[in-house]
Amino acid sequence: MAIKKYKPTSNGRRGMTVLDFSEITTDQPEKSLLAPLKKKAGRNNQGKITVRHQGGGHKRQYRIIDFKRDKDGIPGRVATIEYDPNRSANIALIHYADGEKRYIIAPKNLKVGMEIMSGPDADIKVGNALPLENIPVGTFVHNIELKPGRGGQLVRAAGTSAQVLGKEGKYVIVRLASGEVRMILGACRATVGEVGNEQHELVKIGKAGRARWLGIRPTVRGSVMNPVDHPHGGGEGKAPIGRKSPMTPWGKPTLGFKTRKKKNKSDKFIIRRRKK
């Protein structure tokens, strides 16, 4: 999709960009694949904020996505490409030959009318899902499982892709979008191709109100808070932090401080750590 720019008719419009949604073929989602979505506003079951800067925004309905891609041997036809308010990628509605309908993440270059398949015998074609051990070296993939049958967990955001680098025993070596190179069980499934809507990261929100429509609340600097609210708070005027390193609101070091567990079980599967 292309990026649409506006003339600076107001301060909010100046610099603001939007996607032109030229790939979207319908604005009516499949009702049987919708579920109610209650707003959490970043709170947990105790009502405490666990994720800051969330709340408000336009009402949404959840689209039930098929991350498992376990409908083996039954061809499906792409009926529509749709917008999904709950993720950066677009989604595709698939009509299977047996009458079932499912949503999948829409890969790049997937068009209405194309046919897709799942299973070990599927062709290496955009939108097809098969075990990593059956995918040739060099192929770009997305929606990768970490455990067979659990459903895709990695590489699902707009414009992302991973590359199959090699095979070693029952494991397949994959370079992820972050630059991390790791081993994943060959029985885990992945979908061929890159995730579509790659222009998503180039969109400029342009004004605070548009961020609020998306459910994003303001981010306040710690240095302008009071000492009771943040370790950086207090002092006269633009006071320095007054500590050896920047701190989180809860007094933990941040900005360069390592937060990964030193003895993480998944370390043995990581060949090269992600780019900093």
Swiss-Prot record:
Per UniProt, the keywords (alphabetical) are: Ribonucleoprotein, Ribosomal protein, RNA-binding, rRNA-binding
Which GO molecular function terms does the record list? rRNA binding; structural constituent of ribosome; transferase activity
Q: Which InterPro entries match?
A: NA-bd_OB-fold, Rib_uL2_dom2, Ribosomal_uL2, Ribosomal_uL2_bac/org-type, Ribosomal_uL2_C, Ribosomal_uL2_CS, Ribosomal_uL2_dom3, Ribosomal_uL2_RNA-bd_dom
Cellular component (GO) terms are: large ribosomal subunit
Q: Where is the composition biased (Basic residues)?
A: 258-276
Q: Which domain of life is it from?
A: Bacteria
An example GO BP is: cytoplasmic translation
Q: State the residue spans of region: Disordered.
A: 224-276
What SMART domains does the database record attribute to this sequence? Answer: Ribosomal_L2, Ribosomal_L2_C
Give the similarity note.
Answer: Belongs to the universal ribosomal protein uL2 family.
> What is the annotated quaternary arrangement, including any partners?
Part of the 50S ribosomal subunit. Forms a bridge to the 30S subunit in the 70S ribosome.
Question: Entry's PANTHER family?
Answer: LARGE RIBOSOMAL SUBUNIT PROTEIN UL2M, RIBOSOMAL PROTEIN L2
What does this protein do, in the record's words?
One of the primary rRNA binding proteins. Required for association of the 30S and 50S subunits to form the 70S ribosome, for tRNA binding and peptide bond formation. It has been suggested to have peptidyltransferase activity; this is somewhat controversial. Makes several contacts with the 16S rRNA in the 70S ribosome.
Q: What is this protein called?
A: Large ribosomal subunit protein uL2
Q: Which gene encodes it?
A: rplB
